[in-house]
Amino acid sequence: RTKPELRNQERYNAAKLTEAGVPVAFNTDALVFPIDLLAASAKIAVLAGLPWQQALESLTIRSAEAAGVADEIGSVTVGKRADLLVFSRDPIDLLVKPDAVFVDGICLN
């Protein structure tokens, strides 16, 4: 079962849009598509041709831009909130968990 707006979704869309110069952001409506699976969208796009760096940007700065909050979050920049996940492995690996979680610069683990 899937949502009607996903009917024409194709795994190559992110790569095609990026090649055409269109910024791509990954998102989820967490009650329907669990946020834990957000990296899966990026991983599928990479396997379908989206460059890894573009996938990471789509999960971070492009999503912040789409939400209108890129001045606060989405990149490691002086003056922005220090909400960070630290990984020792590929962050879009489907099974990887963060080594550290920071919210407003405070390590939560």
Predicted regions and their residues:
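C-terminal cap of metal-dependent C-N hydrolases
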Residues: 65, 77-109
